[in-house]
Amino acid sequence: MAKEKYDRSKPHVNIGTIGHVDHGKTTLTAAITTVLARRLPSSVNQPKDYASIDAAPEERERGITINTAHVEYETEKRHYAHIDAPGHADYVKNMITGAAQMDGAILVVASTDGPMPQTREHILLSRQVGVKHLIVFMNKVDLVDDEELLELVEMEIRDLLSEYDFPGDDLPVIQGSALKALEGDSKYEDIVMELMNTVDEYIPEPERDTDKPLLLPVEDVFSITGRGTVASGRIDRGTVRVNDEIEIVGLQEEKSKAVVTGVEMFRKQLDEGLAGDNVGVLLRGVQRDEIERGQVISKPGSINPHTKFKGEVYILTKEEGGRHTPFFDNYRPQFYFRTTDVTGSIKLPEGTEMVMPGDNVTIDVELIHPIAVEQGTTFSIREGGRTVGSGMVTEIEA
């Protein structure tokens, strides 16, 4: 049978299941794939059972071992990539490293338990790493006979979401049973379809990478006699065209401007380079020694150099190749942003004396050189070239 071509006509959205251990995230993931395969059969909609999702392979993302299951499915309107991570630590790592970029998530809460500690932690992490849209699935409602109890649990979840600045009063809450839907109970299958309609409607289509402002991390710089300076790298987002005015940002207090006079890929001239392309960009108005690896080429005004920010970080365990000992306030490692290391110092939150390998924590960082950063920029924490942590910028301070 010929391989079917990947259909790009439907908008693509990344989502995931989050919530406390044993509340039914993986069962719900299995139920979504199974019910869609029954109701909307297609080459994409294949049922996945609990065991195959639960046996997620280990992946290494920036030196960190993460177990994550990736499944895909489609509704009539959209194509989805769905991530489900079996263990709590896998979620924390996934979200902080940006390994799993979710446009929205389904928060699974067992009606029998209500919100639990990891429910709270996953909501906080979603807020920190910029997952803006959550939908609640109250699972296991078949095990609760008391309507009032269900109402109380729903109120509790809504209050918790509001506490972390989500629209707790307004966001959708769907009550169902993932297990019953998986077993083929049509009442509960209907609820899974209702959940997917809600996901279609409530989670907005993400802005495509090519529509965002240009960001090109500089990896290499050389000069071509008689033509000027070339900076090369992989375009992170946006597009670059001949005659564009750009800014060079980072490692200096001031930004400098230049004009693009050529774009090349694989030694061929292009009219434009797009997000994902490895390009060389010929620049007018900049000398070979005025641009270096670690800076970024960006759309003017879109990103600025900063030295102080708050970050949410995960510190690797000894087994992952991280530190064997805790670190304390004013720890000074290197922060690796995109293509370069910059030394910085860490201030720990009030009341936190030390950070152990395997912990996640919110830190204040001050770098010795400014770097082009914004909310959502990811980084690694390194010591002598060895990764000891991974994080994401949550707030710019200076």
Curated annotation (Swiss-Prot):
Coiled coil: none
Binding site for GTP: 19-26, 84-88, 139-142
Region (G4): 139-142
Gene Ontology MF terms: GTP binding; GTPase activity; translation elongation factor activity
Region ranges (G5): 177-179
Reactions performed catalytically: GTP + H2O = GDP + phosphate + H(+)
Domain tr-type G residues, every copy: 10-207
Subcellular location: Cytoplasm
Ranges where the record places region G1: 19-26
Protein EC: 3.6.5.3
InterPro entries: EF-Tu_GTP-bd, EF-Tu_GTPase, EFTu-like_2, EFTU_2, G_TR_CS, P-loop_NTPase, Small_GTP-bd, T_Tr_GTP-bd_dom
Binding sites annotated in the UniProt record for Mg(2+): T26
Region (G2): 63-67
Positions of the UniProt region annotated as G3: 84-87
GO CC term, one of those recorded: cytosol
Quaternary assembly: Monomer.
PANTHER family: ELONGATION FACTOR TU, MITOCHONDRIAL (PTHR43721:SF22), ELONGATION FACTOR TU-RELATED (PTHR43721)
Family to which the UniProt record says this protein belongs: Belongs to the TRAFAC class translation factor GTPase superfamily. Classic translation factor GTPase family. EF-Tu/EF-1A subfamily.
Protein name: Elongation factor Tu
